[in-house]
């Protein structure tokens, strides 16, 4: 029985035809029993495809449809779309899924209601409202389409009456007439899509699957924007089909497409937010603008760093280092008897000449905001090449090296000529791994305020006694057991310092020069091993240049002839009472045999051919040291007339840090050497009276 439109009849909604679609037979049985209690005419179906067939065969056989959302053969939303396009019946969705997004999806697809399982009796009693609402909307549309011709015929008369009313009634009547005119114009605009010639109701057309497919083909042929009812009707060419039928179906089809587009847009937006083209404010955790404004980094270095981080090719190179720890020590100031003599750690960025360095390992793409660099090649440092290239790259490439932080890189080694660099006072120089691999025509000459720290560990600086922080320190890159091996380095402010030579645990000896204000005695000391005697000169640091070139023997030689030992004779005598032999085998920072005897004896200077040329330090004290078990390294055979790893004037210190090129104010210091190419400086190892 069809529902009564006014709702006042006693029989309504008795006999309202309801189609229930659900794959659960139990749910179907319960719903059918509840609908019968509400005095509805209920029909059940367990398959969505079969229900769609029943609707197409007998569209007027049902007033409302109740469908489950999740079904195996067809989704409930798909059934909702097909029913909305073909039959235009009210559809109520039901499901045990009460999520808001699922309910919203059903409403967007055109469902008039959404019931949550288990369905209550009160909800089923009120489903007739959707049927009445649907019928009311259809009747309203037909009334508007039927009164269109009457509106067109009465428009001139109404306009004349309005103008007459405005002339007779004054301003108030004019405002009312204009308002009525605007309302009628709006109504005319809304009714333009209808058929002007239709003055009576037309029979409803059942849009079957074949008819709807013809309609869709016609729309696709014309295009959704250019499809109009007249052209669609011509393309379909179906007898009995009117322009009004096509216009109504086209309107529903467009609404359906609009709902689908809105649904897909709403689903895609949370997962695909619009891409923002924000500018890169900082890279690698660095605020470039703040650095440039505070003057901590020059504009050229800023541009080079930005280019490197952004992956653009540039001649500048940034060396952030392997680890992100930097050498941050406070500036330590010492006495200044000869001018500027302070060593500052954590200084600003050093720069060198454009042709000082060449190719470094190229940076890989940034990870975590900072560019990563490939591993440095573990090459030994050889300086036989004098063509001005470093690592295979010409000096003319003008690569500016910006040290972002002073960091330690154990595996990093530079290869090439470094003779164009001098060490700046208060600079920090990091030597390479092993100094016994030097091969150059010039020696190494650090200036008086130069600090050479081991490249292997930064613990050397932290463990440095306070007294050593006042003077320059020169140490090898290998861990020096003599610097950390139980030696008291506290300056006792005595008039003389005892003699000690440090020997490291690696291939090279540790090397420290402090240049105290009061120098030790003048005698040249010697300590012998079974094979190699070598000189130790107190208060010596630089290589003397007044003697003939020294001859360094190879591993098979029994002795090393030295020509570096001329020292001034103005030093005060040394208090030999400070020297004492030890009962334990702590000698030069190493543990040896207990057969150590100590004495002093003057040693003549010898030239490169073994001839005595004079005493370097005439004095009254005579003592010597004997040791049978001292670990001493030997130099490889590098040829005659070359200084293997010695420190001399006019050369540079190999370092992975770039420093400014400047001449040292002090160049007249003397040197003495050991068998492994290290400078033995006795005046800086103070031990409180014992060795």
From Swiss-Prot:
Two-component system major event consists of a His-to-Asp phosphorelay between a sensor histidine kinase (HK) and a response regulator (RR). In plants, the His-to-Asp phosphorelay involves an additional intermediate named Histidine-containing phosphotransfer protein (HPt). This multistep phosphorelay consists of a His-Asp-His-Asp sequential transfer of a phosphate group between first a His and an Asp of the HK protein, followed by the transfer to a conserved His of the HPt protein and finally the transfer to an Asp in the receiver domain of the RR protein. The keyword Glycosyltransferase does not apply. Its main location: nucleus. SUPFAM superfamilies: CheY-like (SSF52172), Homeodomain-like (SSF46689). It comes from the Eukaryota. It is found in: Nucleus. CDD domains: REC_typeB_ARR-like. Keywords: Activator, Cytokinin signaling pathway, DNA-binding, Nucleus, Phosphoprotein, Transcription, Transcription regulation, Two-component regulatory system. Residues 17-132 form the Response regulatory domain. Residues 139-155 have a biased composition (Basic and acidic residues). Residues 199-258 bind DNA. One of its GO terms (biological process) is cytokinin-activated signaling pathway. One of its GO terms (cellular component) is nucleus. The keyword Transcription applies. Disruption phenotype: Dwarf, narrow leaf, lesion mimic, low tillering and late heading phenotypes. One of its GO terms (molecular function) is DNA binding. The modification 4-aspartylphosphate is found at residue 68. Residues 139-204 are annotated as: Disordered. Belongs to the ARR family. Type-B subfamily. Transcriptional activator that binds specific DNA sequence. Functions as a response regulator involved in His-to-Asp phosphorelay signal transduction system. Phosphorylation of the Asp residue in the receiver domain activates the ability of the protein to promote the transcription of target genes. May directly activate some type-A response regulators in response to cytokinins. This is Two-component response regulator ORR21. It comes from Oryza sativa subsp. japonica.
